[in-house]
């Protein structure tokens, strides 16, 4: 399940940047944007399944950290969607980019720090 979740995230980020480049070039990126929304669903479902699986075995304060990672992941998805919607409407995206980047850094940090992820830290 972890590999499916990581693959969904990787495809989601690729589709996000493809849709962003299409919108910023003035072309229609609606099809790619819809594909990205499908990836959002897959990311949320696989993430929730991972969360429920870890709740059976997590000890001490791991519940809290995985809950925070899930909230940060939902903020990343929200940030991605808000950036693309504002881009499609030709509105300013500065603050939304800030939300997206901060949440993405938090998700990657927690993903690398927590026991299920890679043991970099």
Curated annotation (Swiss-Prot):
Membrane topology category: Multi-pass membrane protein
KW Cell membrane (keyword) present: yes
Domain of life: Bacteria
TM region positions: 6-26, 38-58, 65-85, 92-112
Keyword field: Cell membrane, Membrane, Transmembrane, Transmembrane helix
A GO CC term attached to the entry: plasma membrane
Record's keyword annotation contains Metal-binding: no
Name used for this protein in its record: UPF0344 protein BCA_1194
Organism for this UniProt entry: Bacillus cereus (strain 03BB102)
């Amino acid at each position: 399940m972890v590999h499916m979740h990581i693959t969904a995230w990787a495809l989601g980020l690729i589709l996000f940047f493809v849709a962003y480049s299409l919108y910023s070039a003035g072309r229609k990126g609606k099809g790619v944007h819809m594909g990205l929304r499908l990836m959002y669903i897959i990311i949320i479902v696989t993430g929730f399944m991972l969360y429920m699986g870890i709740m059976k075995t997590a000890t001490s304060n791991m519940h809290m950290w995985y809950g925070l990672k899930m909230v940060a992941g939902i903020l990343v998805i929200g940030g991605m969607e808000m950036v693309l919607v504002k881009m499609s409407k030709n509105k300013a995206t500065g603050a939304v980019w800030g939300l997206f980047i901060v949440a993405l850094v938090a998700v990657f940090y927690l993903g690398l720090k927590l026991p299920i992820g890679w043991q970099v830290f």
